[in-house]
């Protein structure tokens, strides 16, 4: 499929992550095919498309999560702050401190709410007790959770509701002060009220972070994102401003997917 239309979409904003000629393989399976994409800084970019199209695969390349699994490899350029992440000699943990990730299912650590936030910070910074207290409160406030948990910080993170757990995971992700936050279907396991709270939070987070979200929910992409990429069978079909892609798509494949004639 020709992806030149998608890859040449011009952005007015500064690019935070630049993807050029990216291919990805699960063993011999060619999962992503010559992806070209610019992720704008301090905006929300959504990846949409049917199951198996490569959305989550692309997301996990941005912090080299794929390296945790055998026989997976990426080829091409994924430039972040002027450096190709795929060939960087930096400690992967250092890369992930700059590119945080929140998964589909809430994954609080088996420890207190406080320690869930402090755990990652301790890996990269040596803060005294007072400064750590301030960082924990700051992260929980950023995740719109402080008011709900400030009196029970010593309770287990798993004691929270599903929506609260997901916001705890977001707080944990931003506590180390990354530059990019990756969200892999963060609302798929949540009820509508919790989903609304997370969507409000996403709108707030883009003031400080570059946010990339994978979602099966096209309405969510339309509500939350500034830019949207439509993917199909490992190809980037179309990329552009969310309003344009949803209301004036350039590709028939995109229009068919959005209007429900496909997928």
Swiss-Prot record:
Task: Give the chief site where it resides.
Answer: membrane
Membrane topology is: Peripheral membrane protein
Write down the chemical reaction(s) this protein catalyses: phosphate(out) + ATP + H2O = ADP + 2 phosphate(in) + H(+)
According to the UniProt record, which cysteines are disulfide-bonded?
A: none
EC number(s) on file: 7.3.2.1
Tell whether NADP is among the UniProt keywords: no
Q: Which function does this protein serve?
A: Part of the ABC transporter complex PstSACB involved in phosphate import. Responsible for energy coupling to the transport system.
Question: Could you tell me what this protein is called?
Answer: Phosphate import ATP-binding protein PstB
């Amino acid at each position: 499929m020709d992806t030149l239309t998608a890859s040449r979409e011009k952005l007015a904003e500064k690019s935070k992550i630049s993807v050029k000629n990216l291919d990805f393989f699960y063993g011999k399976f060619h999962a992503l095919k010559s992806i070209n994409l610019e992720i704008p800084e301090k905006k929300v970019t959504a990846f949409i498309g049917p199951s198996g199209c490569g959305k989550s695969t692309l997301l996990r390349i941005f912090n080299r999560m794929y390296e945790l699994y055998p026989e997976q490899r990426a080829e091409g350029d994924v430039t972040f702050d002027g450096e190709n992440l795929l060939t960087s000699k930096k400690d992967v943990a250092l890369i992930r401190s700059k590119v945080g990730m929140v998964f589909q299912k809430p994954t609080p650590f088996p420890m207190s709410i406080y320690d869930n936030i402090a755990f990652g910070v301790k890996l990269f910074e040596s803060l005294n007790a007072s400064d750590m207290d301030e960082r924990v409160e700051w992260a929980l406030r950023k995740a719109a959770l402080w008011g709900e948990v400030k009196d029970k910080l010593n309770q287990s993170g798993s004691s929270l509701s599903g929506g609260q757990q997901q916001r705890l995971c977001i707080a944990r992700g931003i506590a180390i002060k990354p530059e990019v936050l990756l969200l892999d279907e963060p609302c798929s396991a949540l009820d509508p009220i919790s989903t609304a709270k997370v969507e409000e939070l996403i709108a707030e987070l883009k003031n400080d972070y570059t946010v990339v979200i994978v979602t099966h929910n096209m309405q969510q992409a339309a509500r939350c994102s500034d830019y949207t990429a439509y993917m199909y069978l490992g190809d980037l079909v179309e990329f552009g401003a969310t309003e344009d892609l949803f209301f004036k798509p350039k590709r028939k494949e995109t229009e068919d997917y959005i209007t429900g004639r496909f997928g």
